Amino acid sequence: MEENEAVCWGQKLAKELKVVLPISFYEKEVNNLYNSVACIDADGDLVGVYRKTHIPDDHYYQEKFYFTPGDTGFRVFDTRYGKIGVGICWDQWFPETARCMALEGAELLFYPTAIGSEPILACDSMPHWRRCMQGHAAMNLMPVIAANRIGREEVKPCVENGGQESSLIFYGSSFITDETGELLQTASRDQEEILTETFDLDELAAKRLEWGLFRDRRPKCYGKITE
């Protein structure tokens, strides 16, 4: 990982700009490949790595051909500016991801993403995708920051992908919500953009205590979730 080009670039940039960066990269360990995120602190140091838990497999997202399900568990990284939980793409569709990170002390939820519209099915999943994460914010009283790529990508038939052919238009639409799920900042579908927002983490922590959502949880009643 120390030699990964994206991670090394992220470390230099984080140190230069004094920012925290979750950097996506492909991680190899012996014979296993993982879809991973390296969390880099504002001094350029590596805080830790999260390996994607949920691995999709359908006509457009063929990750099970390549990636092993992550073994790190959900991670929360204690950085210079706060505690951040990071899920990767398909992880964002599972409420368990957000709740586990919240229970581990996250103050902000990040979801680096690569998702798009499927021309063959004439399907635009963007509104559903966005509402799903707005729900995570509202249920955990925690801001969500989701970054999605843009552009078109063609997949040609080959042995490695089982002879499948498809194309995907990544629809961008990155966004930031407040702790109730309300959209504060949104990006376009086809342009590179930078979104910024300011949060008072102490104020947000006080709101979570006031609502009592975590106080009133009853984990012994949730056995079905782990079956």
Question: Predicted regions span which residues?
Answer:
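Glycine-rich acetyl-CoA-binding "A-motif" of GNAT/NAT acetyltransferases
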Residues: 33, 46, 183
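Active-site beta-strand termini and strand-to-loop segments that position acidic
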Residues: 41-42, 77-80, 178-179, 199
